Amino acid sequence: MMKSIILIVLDGLGDRPGSDLQNRTPLQAAFRPNLNWLASHGINGIMHPISPGIRCGSDTSHMSLLGYDPKVYYPGRGPFEALGLGMDIRPGDLAFRANFATNRDGVIVDRRAGRENKGNEELADAISLDMGEYSFRVKSGVEHRAALVVSGPDLSDMIGDSDPHREGLPPEKIRPTDPSGDRTAEVMNAYLEEARRILSDHRVNKERVKNGRLPGNELLVRSAGKVPAIPSFTEKNRMKGACVVGSPWLKGLCRLLRMDVFDVPGATGTVGSNYRGKIEKAVDLTSSHDFVLVNIKATDVAGHDGNYPLKRDVIEDIDRAMEPLKSIGDHAVICVTGDHSTPCSFKDHSGDPVPIVFYTDGVMNDGVHLFDELSSASGSLRITSYNVMDILMQLAGRSDKFGS
């Protein structure tokens, strides 16, 4: 019998011991009976995202977990962000991640314009322009975030960013990284100058300044990319795929792979999200889909904040939400892992491996009874993210035999 698959990715799960938790990791310090139950009934190990020592992004790691080599298919983050916001991207279009930022006297004083969102749709509409042969479409996202899609002849993604990536610096002039990007850099610089003029004079920003708030008078762009020619998830893995995720960029990746994207009320993509709702939705989807991806972002948020106790508490909240997984092993394969480590001491992605567990009825436990960085390392698996899909398909009775 072929089984459905649920892959649960706890973003930035892995960590390092911290004095705030008596020299334990947040995972070790957390009360986690359901994760430990999965470990006690499953196959355990450690997983290197991409390969040992690589500090990967969530985007490249998720691509590899889904069976795609990011060295071949990764288009940059821009297309994911735009697709995640529901924008159309045609072949040849160029997509960017974008922020509304605050420019004061030619210097970026806040890359996020106070994380203000009210009025950003108006700002985005105001700088969605046609300039000669080129059209520029901007869509507002969560808080200060946005995406930009450029259409026109001979666009190249061989260009840099306008985002200086920290405050106290002027916005960068976009420069080509290859001669093929010369014309695109010129077009982008002309557009960003016009956008700056429009934003500085816009009613929304004048109102913000009047009320002592930061104006979003600069559009910072980065991560230019084009949509690649890429096989759908169904074409590649012979499964009908779904995702239950909150982050717009990850929705964009799933849409690029032609997976079905589902929203859950209260699933915010941050701390306090509706974790139980996500798990219950994934369980429900096993009746209509062969594969379900769940991403929970809150662990990564706590790691980037350097907050050991918060990351421990988030893991405990997530663990409570996982109770329904223990009763579906007869018809589903469950995998729980991270996409990378985000140690609280480092406040960024590291190259450390992450724990991983595979569970379904009938698998032989490898003697591991706790789910954490150290205990899982005594399990039977030492794998990379490229191995995960093969293991899942084999356990689900969906793999082909290699040879005769």
Swiss-Prot record:
InterPro entries: Alkaline_phosphatase_core_sf (IPR017850), ApgAM_prokaryotes (IPR023665), Metalloenzyme (IPR006124), Pglycerate_mutase_ApgM (IPR004456), Pglycerate_mutase_ApgM_sf (IPR042253). GO terms for biological process: glycolytic process. The keyword Plastid does not apply. Pathway: Carbohydrate degradation; glycolysis; pyruvate from D-glyceraldehyde 3-phosphate: step 3/5. Residues 162-183 have a biased composition (Basic and acidic residues). Residues 155-183 are annotated as: Disordered. Its EC number is 5.4.2.12. Keywords: Glycolysis, Isomerase. GO terms for molecular function: metal ion binding; phosphoglycerate mutase activity. It catalyses: (2R)-2-phosphoglycerate = (2R)-3-phosphoglycerate. PANTHER family: COFACTOR-INDEPENDENT PHOSPHOGLYCERATE MUTASE, METALLOENZYME DOMAIN-CONTAINING PROTEIN. Belongs to the BPG-independent phosphoglycerate mutase family. A-PGAM subfamily. Catalyzes the interconversion of 2-phosphoglycerate and 3-phosphoglycerate. This is 2,3-bisphosphoglycerate-independent phosphoglycerate mutase. It comes from Thermoplasma acidophilum (strain ATCC 25905 / DSM 1728 / JCM 9062 / NBRC 15155 / AMRC-C165). The gene is apgM.
